[in-house]
Structures are given as structure tokens and as C-alpha cells.
Curated annotation (Swiss-Prot):
GO cellular component terms, A-Z: peroxisome
Chain positions recorded as glyoxylate binding sites: Y25, Y130, R165, H255, R258
Organism from which the protein derives: Oryza sativa subsp. indica
One function term, GO molecular function aspect: FMN binding
SUPFAM superfamilies on file: FMN-linked oxidoreductases (SSF51395)
UniProt entry keywords in alphabetical sequence: Flavoprotein, FMN, Glycolate pathway, Oxidoreductase, Peroxisome, Photorespiration
Family, as annotated: Belongs to the FMN-dependent alpha-hydroxy acid dehydrogenase family.
Protein name: Glycolate oxidase 5
Motif (Microbody targeting signal): 367-369
Gene designation: GLO5
Names of required cofactors: FMN
Amino acid sequence: MGEITNVTEYQAIAKQKLPKMIYDYYASGAEDEWTLQENREAFARILFRPRILIDVSKIDMATTVLGFKISMPIMIAPSAMQKMAHPDGEYATARAASAAGTIMTLSSWATSSVEEVASTGPGIRFFQLYVYKDRRVVEQLVRRAERAGFKAIALTVDTPRLGRREADIKNRFVLPPFLTLKNFEGLELGKMDQASDSGLASYVAGQIDRTLSWKDVKWLQTITTLPILVKGVITAEDTRLAVENGAAGIIVSNHGARQLDYVPATISALEEVVKAARGQLPVFLDGGVRRGTDVFKALALGAAGVFIGRPVVFSLAAAGEAGVRNVLQMLRDEFELTMALSGCTSLADITRNHVITEADKLGVMPSRL
């Protein structure tokens, strides 16, 4: 293979390099994988309305997220068990994010602990949290994240049960024996037992609390001063509840299309959420972002920034830290080019008028120009 020219090319390399069980775990979605495909295809249906004859000799992509300044509105989403992809795992991802001047979100189910990731050096990091049946575990995780200098909690709210991921069932997916879920070492929650279907599905059924509700968001606010992002919101109704319950922000996410199939692509759900939020909290997006053009489209539809997941693990598998650095750089370069060719010199210049969605094509568009 010649020089890698875009983010997607890393996936084919990862597929060659990784054992089938591990590649399938990262790559697959729930059931028919309709939403998995739609997360990408929905971006392709959004077109640009570029503005011309604007001085774009200087472009500023910097932004702030929850008060933290970052170099670009492209951040790293939580992806579990990264040492399955590469021996350096989350260490490499943390270093790459820090070098790029952006945020890394560490998964609860990481194969490196919060303390280990913090030891890689300075960086703005968020901690993704699942709520366990044993609330003492949750409290302990939050305290450790605080002590390790993590700046926010990304609370995953779309996983009362694990989605039906048929590739994992076929492969009888289980965390390889040489790895553990490092944040749970010593809690007897760090290992995943072999199961007749998917070891992860059995693990979730045994540990994750299905009673999770908005009252638990309130409870979390009593045990930490860290801002709480609610990850997994795709409707206006839940957006309004997130605002009412004091969320610091929302991540529009369908869990990489790994939970409920036939939910909309996140880019399709974004505007509904943004409108319901009414500017009261920032709205972010993950799911299907593979190009700088995707980043621009998300911002034009009201996102404050995007998170990338699979591109990180695929590039990590292919080339370790250098791969993740390259993915972040390629997306940055593409996004900068898209801004220039659209006539935007800062993120504030990117407006709803820069894009045409399916709804616009049905005749809604002229009213807003």
C-alpha cells in the first residue's frame, strides 16, 4: 500500500493486522448494521454552499470545550480495550491527543488505568463512565479520575443492556487473557469470562445498572464537581431533560451504531438536539466522522465539536501512536481546507447557510436565506 491519504485507509490495514475476533469487535455494529452504514451515508447526503472571494489566508480552528482551549474541534471518543489494537493502547492515544492539542476521552473499559494514562504527561482528558450496580465502584472510579487530573465525566446513557452485536456472538468475543480492564483491577471486575455468546454481553448484564435514570445524573453531581456530559442523546425530549438536570453538555451519539439498530445517523439527529438545547449547553457529535468535510458539516448544523472513535483504534492497530497522530493531522488538514474553500476563517464563520440537508432539498431551504 502506498502513502496513506485518508483516514478510512487505516481500516483495511487494521483488518489485515488484527485477529478476526478483535477486528470484528471494533468494526461491527448491532444487528443488521443499518445504522452503522447510515452513520457514514447520511454525511454524504449533506451538500455545501461555499462562499467565494473571501480572504482565507489565515484560518483559526481553535475552540474551547467546557472552558478548555483546544487546537481544533476534533476530539477522541472513548473506545474500549485499546491494547487489543496495539501494545501501547491508551498510552499511545493519550500522547497523540496531547501532541495534537486536543481532548482524549478514556473509556471505563480501558486496558490502561486512569493513573497510567495520566502518567503519559500533560493533556486535557475526559473520563467515560458507565454506572455499575455497585455505586461504590462508580464513586471510586470518579474519585480516581478526579485525582488523576481528568477534567470531565462523559456519562454513557444508551447502554442499560448491550446491543446485539452478532459478530461478537459468532466469535464468542472475550477480552484476551493477557489483558485486563485496568480501572477495575482488584475489584473482581477486571476480567471477562468466556460465555456461550459474547463475553462482553454477559459482563454488561452482570455489572451495568439497568435502573439508571435522571436521578442518577443528579446523584453524580453530588459526588463530583466535574462537569458531566451526557453521551447518547438523540432526541429533543431527552435534550430538554438533560438541560433540566444540569448536564454540562450533550454528546449526540448512537454508540457507534452498536446499541439499537435503525436509530438515525447522529448527523441526522443533530439538528433536532441543537434546536431543543436552545444554546443552553454545548452539543457535540460522534459517529461516522471520517473526513474534514464531516467535521464542517457537523459544525454547520450546530455541533460545538466532534469526537472520533474507530479511526483512532484502526490507526492505532496499523501504526501505533504515529497512526493516531496522522489521523488527527489528516482530519485537521482536511477541515482547514474545507473551511478555506467554504470561505470561513474561524469556527464562528461556519453557519447553517453553508450546508444543504435532505430537509432543505424538500423545499425548506429558501425560507432561511
